């Protein structure tokens, strides 16, 4: 910088360099010029804009540590930042809080707040929830990318036993990984259907046989088919347990508990039958066996493992507990009120079917849920009027929470598709940058397999700094710095 420009700066210790509350601070953020005043900025002295008040006394080093450029003639500070985000950030000086405008990326906005040194506590609660939701999405994308990278990478330091476990786990848990894995997944799906159909067919009297003691039991052919299915389910569960990287988490997960409930009744029934025969307590044992056989219906839930739609529906119902609780509360109040009214109004009829209020609960339930079996019905005019009102109230009560539940389902389904697309997009960009760094104009995904092993794990940078390590618009905060260098990504400035 020339001498004339240096001389145009206020001298340290001069009157001009002393910050006052009436000083004007002119900032140019992304081409948008803004005039701010010292008394306004001094409310939050720890922010970057407030530091501009006293920076002139520190010379060029201090000035350029705070801004990208400075015009001594105009006393104008230049910042190469997002002007839209800046307009939101300076609201803290006027209103004491910050609102993130629609259309601004939450993660970029957080970076802007960090740059201007405005604490996140000034961000409004509604905007914090949006930022938290976006952060969860990024963590999910990072988790998916990390899993795919782990599957693609081969660590030569791992033993043969560990590599074998990873291959078995990938074979059983990721049907899309290979053609044989798809075949096994389809076979498992078909066996679930076959075992469910066999369970139902075993209750048909024409397909049952009489044993030596005169009891009707399932046909031996159906029992053999069920035994074969149970053998497959058992082998599949044991292999997945054997290859699981975290066996405790595997055993306690919901879907694996369903798998255990699907195969456990078979072995418990078999054990109780043999023990009962020895102890001559066949009556009690048979009752226990029949009770356990009912648990076989749990195997139908195994279909959720092969159906993303069922998994989405389960998640939507879990997220709709509040709406479902309101529905049950409305129905419970309505059942109590209308059953009591129905019992009271029907007492004048000599052939009334409403013997008591608890017995009337059944009538209120089937009326409010629009089932109407017809086993209990009102016979008086007031009773019929009460039935009509209870019917209408039931329709309204059931319809109210349906829309939020559908919204939760659609939102989660769309979110899963977006996350899946974002993860694939990030991997494609990683591969593209890796191929470009190697001087290959068109590398293939198999190039990732030849990457050097990942360095020893160490504590990575903070969440905010990890965001800047990604080169694309899809930030993946959980990927470590070594992983990014491993794929030769360019830092996002």
UniProtKB/Swiss-Prot annotation:
Q: Where in the cell is it found?
A: Cell membrane
What Pfam families has UniProt attached to this entry? BTB_2 (PF02214), Ion_trans (PF00520)
Q: Which residues cross the membrane?
A: 184-204, 224-244, 250-270, 290-310, 325-345, 386-406
All ranges on the Cytoplasmic side of the membrane: 1-183, 245-249, 311-324, 407-493
Tell me the membrane topology, using the record's own terms: Multi-pass membrane protein
Q: Which CDD domains does this entry report, sorted A to Z?
A: BTB_POZ_Kv5_KCNF1
Q: What is this protein called?
A: Voltage-gated potassium channel regulatory subunit KCNF1
Q: Where is it mostly found?
A: membrane
Tell me the subunit arrangement. Answer: Heterotetramer with KCNB1 or KCNB2.
User: Single GO cellular component annotation?
Assistant: ciliary base
SUPFAM superfamilies hit by this protein: POZ domain, Voltage-gated potassium channels
Q: Which organism is it from?
A: Mus musculus
Q: Which domain of life is it from?
A: Eukaryota
Q: Which residues lie within the membrane without crossing it?
A: 358-378
| General function of this protein | Regulatory alpha-subunit of the voltage-gated potassium (Kv) channel which, when coassembled with KCNB1 or KCNB2, can modulate their expression and their gating kinetics by acting on deactivation upon repolarization and inactivation during maintained depolarization. Accelerates inactivation but has relatively little effect on deactivation. Coexpression with KCNB1 or KCNB2 markedly slows inactivation.
Region Disordered, as annotated, extends over 434-468
Motif range (Selectivity filter): 370-375
Q: Which GO terms describe its biological process?
A: non-motile cilium assembly; potassium ion transport; protein homooligomerization; regulation of potassium ion transport
Which UniProt keywords are given for this protein, alphabetically ordered?
A: Cell membrane, Ion channel, Ion transport, Membrane, Potassium, Potassium channel, Potassium transport, Transmembrane, Transmembrane helix, Transport, Voltage-gated channel
């Amino acid at each position: 910088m020339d001498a004339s420009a240096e001389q145009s700066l206020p001298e340290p210790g001069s009157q001009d360099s002393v910050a006052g509350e009436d000083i004007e601070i002119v900032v140019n953020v992304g081409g948008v010029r803004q005039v701010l005043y010292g008394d306004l900025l001094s409310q939050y002295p720890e922010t970057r804009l407030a530091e501009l008040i006293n920076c002139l006394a520190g010379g060029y080093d201090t000035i350029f540590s705070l801004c990208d450029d400075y015009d001594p003639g105009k006393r104008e500070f230049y910042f190469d930042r997002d002007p839209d985000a800046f307009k939101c950030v300076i609201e803290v000086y006027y209103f004491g809080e910050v609102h993130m405008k629609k259309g601004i990326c939450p993660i970029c906005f957080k970076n802007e707040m960090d740059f201007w040194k405005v604490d996140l506590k000034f961000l409004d609660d509604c905007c914090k929830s949006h930022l938290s939701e976006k952060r969860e999405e990024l963590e999910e994308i990072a988790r998916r990318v990390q899993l795919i990278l782990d599957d693609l990478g081969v660590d030569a330091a791992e033993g043969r036993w560990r590599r074998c476990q990873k291959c078995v786990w990938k074979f059983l848990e990721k049907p899309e990984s290979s053609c044989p894995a798809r075949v096994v997944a389809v076979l498992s799906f078909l066996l679930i259907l076959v075992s469910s159909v066999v369970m139902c067919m075993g209750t048909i009297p024409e397909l049952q046989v009489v044993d030596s003691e005169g009891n009707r039991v399932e046909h031996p052919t159906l029992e053999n088919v069920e035994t074969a299915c149970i053998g497959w389910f058992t082998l599949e569960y044991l292999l997945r347990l054997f290859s699981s990287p975290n066996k405790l988490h595997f055993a306690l997960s919901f879907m694996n508990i369903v798998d255990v409930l699907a195969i456990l009744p078979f072995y418990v029934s078999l054990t109780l039958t043999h023990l009962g025969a020895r102890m001559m307590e066949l009556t009690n044992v048979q009752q226990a066996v029949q009770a356990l056989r009912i648990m076989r219906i749990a195997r139908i839930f195994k279909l959720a493992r092969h159906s993303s739609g069922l998994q989405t529906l389960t998640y939507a119902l879990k997220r709709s507990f509040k709406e479902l609780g309101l529905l049950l509360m409305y129905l419970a109040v309505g059942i109590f009120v209308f059953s009591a009214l129905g019992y009271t109004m029907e007492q004048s009829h000599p052939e009334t079917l409403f013997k008591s209020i608890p017995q009337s609960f059944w009538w209120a339930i089937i009326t409010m849920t629009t089932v109407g079996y017809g086993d209990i019905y009102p016979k008086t005019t007031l009773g019929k009027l009460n039935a009509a009102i209870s019917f209408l109230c039931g329709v309204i009560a059931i319809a109210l929470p349906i829309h939020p539940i559908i919204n939760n389902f659609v939102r989660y389904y769309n979110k899963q598709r977006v996350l899946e697309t974002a993860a694939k997009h990030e991997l494609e960009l990683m591969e593209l940058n890796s191929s470009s760094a190697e001087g290959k104009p068109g590398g293939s995904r198999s190039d990732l397999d030849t990457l050097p092993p990942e360095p020893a794990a160490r504590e990575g940078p903070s969440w905010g700094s990890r965001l800047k390590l990604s080169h694309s618009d899809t930030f993946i905060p959980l990927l470590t710095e070594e992983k990014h260098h491993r794929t030769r990504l360019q830092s996002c400035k």
